[in-house]
Design a protein with these regions (language model features):
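A membrane-topology feature that recognizes alpha-helical transmembrane segments
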Residues: 321-325
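N-terminal amphipathic alpha-helix/helix-capping segment at the start of soluble metabolic enzymes
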Residues: 33-56
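Active-site entrance/lid segments in N-terminal catalytic domains of soluble metabolic enzymes
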Residues: 2-9, 16-34, 38-39, 59-61, ...
Length: 326
C-alpha cells in the first residue's frame, strides 16, 4: 500500500460514481446504501443546519479524500468533521507510517492533513458536489440533510496566516473558486446521464459549504491562548464553534483507575501530560465565557470532550515515541 494519498480529478470521480452505480448498483464498493428515514436513526439540528442522522466520521484520514467522505455518506453518515488543516502541510509535514493501530482500542500517530491545504480544500468541494448528486439521484435524502464542519489548528498565528485564512473563507463561500466552477461545470455536463438530478438542483447547491468550525490545539496549549483562538473564530470569522478538549481533563488518578478497572492495565502513560494540558479548573470557566460570547454573537458553541489521549509506545506498536488513543 502506498504511503501517499493521491487526489483524483472531479470528472474522474464523477464518472466513477455514475458508472459504478449504472453497472453494479454500488458506490465505491458500498452496495447497501442508507436512505434517510430507514431504521431507528432520527434527524437532529446542528448549529443552525439540519442533519438527517446524528452520526458521521470525526476528523481523520477517513475525511481527507472526497471518495472517503462519499463512502461515509452512502453508509449513513451525515455529519462530517473534515480533516484538520494547519499552516504546515504537504511535503513539509512528515507522518510516519503506519500511523493507525486498531487491533483493540484505537491509536494514531498522525495529526493534520497529509495533503496541502489547497488540495484539502479541493477534496472537500468535490465531496460536497458528489453528496448533493447522490442525495437527489439515488434518493438517499435531502440535499441539505448533511453538514460539513471544517477543522483547523493549532495556534493563532497559523490560523491567521494567509494560507489558512483563504481556506476558511473559501469554505464559507466557495462560489468564486476554480474548483467550485470546475465541479459545477462537470456536474452540469453529466446531467444527461442522470434520471433525477436537474440543472436547477445543481444551481441550488449552496456555496456556503461550512458555517461551523472545530478548533484543535496542541497538547499543552495554555488556556488563555485556546480562548483567544476560539474568540477570534467566532468574532472575526462569524463561525459556529466546536472546541476540542482532551481526556487529560479527567486528571491522572481518575484516568489511571478507570482504565485499570476496565482491564486496560497494559496502557502506559505518565503524569506530565496531565500537568501541562488544559486544567479542569481553567476549562470550566473558559467554556462558560465562550458560551456567553457565542450567544451574544448569535452563534452556537460546543465542546468535543473525547479528542486524543497520549500514551507511551512500549512494544513498537507504531513508529513514534508516543501515540494517541482516539
Amino acid at each position: 500500500m502506498s504511503d501517499r494519498m493521491h487526489c483524483i480529478p472531479f470528472r474522474n470521480l464523477l464518472n466513477w460514481v455514475l458508472g459504478e452505480w449504472e453497472e453494479s448498483g454500488s458506490v465505491f464498493g458500498c452496495k447497501k446504501l442508507y436512505k434517510a428515514g430507514d431504521g431507528e436513526l432520527r434527524p437532529a439540528p446542528f448549529m443552525g443546519r439540519f442533519l438527517e442522522t446524528p452520526i458521521g466520521p470525526a476528523a481523520g484520514p477517513n475525511t481527507q479524500l472526497a471518495q472517503n467522505i462519499v463512502a461515509s455518506y452512502v453508509c449513513g453518515g451525515r455529519m462530517f468533521e473534515l480533516k484538520t488543516v494547519q499552516i504546515i502541510d504537504g511535503e513539509d509535514l512528515h507522518v510516519s507510517k503506519p500511523c493507525i493501530l486498531a487491533e483493540d482500542e484505537g491509536y494514531n500517530c498522525e495529526w493534520s492533513t497529509e495533503l496541502t491545504v489547497q488540495q484539502a480544500f479541493e477534496e472537500y468541494i468535490k465531496a460536497w458536489f458528489l453528496l448533493h448528486l447522490l442525495a437527489k439521484e439515488l434518493s438517499l435524502g435531502r440535499q441539505d440533510g448533511f453538514v460539513f464542519n471544517m477543522s483547523v489548528g493549532y495556534d493563532l498565528a497559523g490560523i491567521k496566516s494567509e494560507k489558512i485564512d483563504r481556506f476558511i473563507e473559501g469554505l464559507k463561500d466557495a462560489s468564486q473558486t476554480e474548483i467550485w466552477k470546475e465541479c459545477r461545470e462537470a456536474l452540469l455536463e453529466a446531467l444527461p446521464r442522470c434520471k433525477h438530478m436537474t440543472e436547477a438542483d445543481v444551481e441550488a447547491i449552496s456555496a456556503n459549504v461550512c458555517s461551523s468550525i472545530t478548533l484543535s490545539t496542541m497538547h499543552g496549549c495554555p488556556a488563555g491562548e485556546i480562548e483567544g483562538i476560539a474568540s477570534y473564530l467566532m468574532e472575526a470569522k462569524g463561525l459556529n464553534l466546536y472546541l476540542k478538549c482532551n481526556p487529560t481533563l479527567l486528571g491522572y488518578e481518575y484516568a489511571r483507575k478507570a482504565l485499570d478497572d476496565l482491564g486496560f492495565t497494559d496502557i502506559s502513560f505518565g503524569r506530565e501530560q496531565f500537568e501541562s494540558d488544559l486544567q479542569y479548573a481553567d476549562a470550566v470557566p473558559m467554556i462558560g465565557r465562550l458560551r456567553e460570547k457565542a450567544a451574544a454573537l448569535g452563534l452556537s458553541f460546543g465542546v468535543k470532550l473525547t479528542n486524543t489521549f497520549p500514551v507511551q509506545v512500549l512494544r513498537g506498536e507504531l513508529p513514534d515515541e508516543a501515540m494517541y488513543m482516539s
